[in-house]
Structure formats: structure tokens, C-alpha cells
Swiss-Prot record:
Domain of life: Bacteria
Cofactor: how bound: Binds 1 heme b group per subunit, that coordinates a highly solvent-exposed Fe(III) atom.
InterPro entries, alphabetized: Calycin, Nb(III)_bact/plant, Nitrobindin, PeroxynitIsom, THAP4-like_heme-bd
Coiled coil, from the record: none
Species of the source: Mycolicibacterium vanbaalenii (strain DSM 7251 / JCM 13017 / BCRC 16820 / KCTC 9966 / NRRL B-24157 / PYR-1)
EC number: 5.99.-.-
Protein's UniProt name: Peroxynitrite isomerase 1
Cofactors required: heme b
Length: 164
């Protein structure tokens, strides 16, 4: 029996423009590390349930070594509200909640942490915020972070383009 793609759940219809694979480049900085560049691939998918699946991988721009990964789920809790549930292999979990603004050409999400969990060996992360904008086939984001005694501040930004 051939696998068929289920219909997109109506609760996440406003998030449909995110579906697909995105690749691009970004840069990072934080007071405790040297600035760095990276390449990134993000995939949003769905299984017909009221959430999108999410997988992200980054590599160092200079030598291609793996840097970071995240996986999780993006849910629409109300027509203009979203929840992003994320797990990191560094021992961190995040629940982010925020505002979704959708228009004819794309969407914008403003998210803040409502909960951060960490394993006993994970570095201290106390707050994370994300601003994500989609216009046509271009996805941009910035990430703010409070960690290891530092206040909430800019950490990452990237521009990605849809490849499929």
C-alpha cells in the first residue's frame, strides 16, 4: 500500500506557508563565545494532526562541522496564538508561546519562553525569544537568549530560502 499525504489539519492552516525545507546562512554571537557563521536546514512537515513537525540542523560555515540541532512541534492554540515545543540534544527543552500574524504574502511569529527545562548536565538557559518572518520563499529569524549568567540579548539571525 502506498503512503499518502494526509490533509493538513484545519487548526494549522495559517501555518501552511512554512511547510517544506528551507536552507540558508546565519550568524551568531554571545558575550561568552567568539562570533561565528553557520549554514542551516529547517524542515516543517505535517501528519494531518493539529501541529506541524519541525527539524533543524546547523553546521559551521568555515569547515562544515555539526553545530546545533532542534526538533519539535509547532501548534496553533488559537487563530492568532502559537506554541512551539522544542528539544535540543544539549539537554534543553523549550516551550515558547506567542503571537501569529498571517497575511496574504506570509506570516510573522513573535515567541517568548513560557517554560525551559534542562537536564543536570545542560548549561543554564533561563530565557529564549524568537522573531520569525516569512515572505514568499524567504524565511528570516532572530533568536534572543539569556544563559550562563547573561541577560536576554541577541544571539542568532539567519536568512533561509525554500528549496522544496
Amino acid at each position: 500500500m502506498a503512503d499518502s499525504v494526509p490533509a493538513l489539519h484545519p487548526d494549522v492552516a495559517a501555518l501552511a506557508p512554512l511547510l517544506g525545507t528551507w536552507v540558508g546562512e546565519g550568524s551568531g554571537e554571545y558575550p561568552t563565545i567568539e562570533p561565528f557563521g553557520y549554514t542551516e536546514e529547517i524542515t516543517f512537515g505535517h501528519v494531518g494532526k493539529p501541529f506541524l513537525t519541525y527539524a533543524q540542523r546547523t553546521r559551521a560555515a568555515d569547515d562544515g562541522r555539526p553545530l546545533h540541532a532542534e526538533t519539535g512541534y509547532l501548534r496553533a492554540s488559537a487563530p492568532d496564538r502559537i506554541e512551539w515545543i522544542l528539544a535540543h540534544p544539549t539537554g534543553i527543552t523549550e516551550i515558547q508561546e506567542g503571537q501569529l500574524t498571517a497575511d496574504g504574502d506570509g506570516l510573522r511569529m513573535e515567541l517568548v519562553s513560557s517554560s525551559i527545562g534542562r537536564s543536570g548536565s545542560a548549561k543554564e538557559v533561563t530565557d529564549v525569544g524568537r522573531s520569525i518572518e516569512l515572505r514568499g520563499d524567504t524565511l528570516t529569524y532572530t533568536l534572543r537568549m539569556a544563559a550562563v549568567g547573561q541577560p536576554l540579548q541577541h544571539h542568532l539571525s539567519a536568512v533561509l530560502r525554500r528549496v522544496r
